[in-house]
């Protein structure tokens, strides 16, 4: 291996990946994804869709998931800085409802692997950020799910000065909490 360093997280399945960066007077080079290296690190997924978004400071996107078509994600930032969060929604998981967050930036070049059945979201910390992610399933617009970003039962510690300064889509302001989600899944 050697081209990537993989850190396991407190929540099983989540992984923070740091690539090896080769730099000189011209700039730098790194592999952002190599199937063999990722497979050796225990990330043996086939990605079928890449997405990219651009956002300004204080934009919060999330917490999102697909209900019937869950997908793994490999996320990174190519410009700026975000605080990226995953919430465990795996049925029967000992860490169900727990969250983990990591700062991703163009500077630290870290990537975050998020397995199926996690809610995902991020907030932009820099003036501007471009966010890139690979997915193991396609987007299904009629299969969207979400959780309230500030649900006290999850307790995410978003590194923002004020919730009032956040910029969110109308849809993201209307998601319910994890108790409502859990009750709806148990019916």
Locations of the language-model features?
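Non-catalytic, conserved peripheral segments adjacent to functional cores
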Residues: 1-107, 126-128, 135-187
């Amino acid at each position: 291996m050697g081209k990537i360093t993989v850190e396991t997280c407190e929540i099983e399945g989540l992984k923070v990946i740091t690539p090896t960066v080769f730099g000189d007077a011209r700039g730098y080079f790194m592999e952002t994804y190599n199937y063999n290296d990722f497979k050796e690190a225990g990330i043996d997924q086939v990605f079928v869709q890449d997405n990219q978004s651009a956002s300004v400071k204080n934009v919060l996107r999330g917490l999102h998931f697909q209900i019937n078509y869950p997908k793994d994600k490999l996320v990174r930032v190519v410009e700026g800085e975000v605080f990226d969060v995953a919430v465990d929604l795996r049925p029967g998981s000992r860490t169900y409802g727990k969250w983990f967050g990591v700062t991703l930036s163009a500077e630290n070049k870290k990537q975050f692997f998020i397995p199926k059945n996690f809610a995902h979201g991020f907030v932009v910390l820099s003036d501007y950020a471009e966010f890139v992610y690979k997915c193991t399933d396609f987007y299904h617009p009629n299969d969207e799910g979400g959780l309230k970003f500030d649900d006290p039962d999850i307790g995410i510690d978003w590194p923002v000065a004020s919730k009032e300064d956040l910029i969110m889509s109308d849809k993201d302001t209307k998601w319910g909490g994890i108790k409502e989600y859990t009750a709806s899944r148990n019916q």
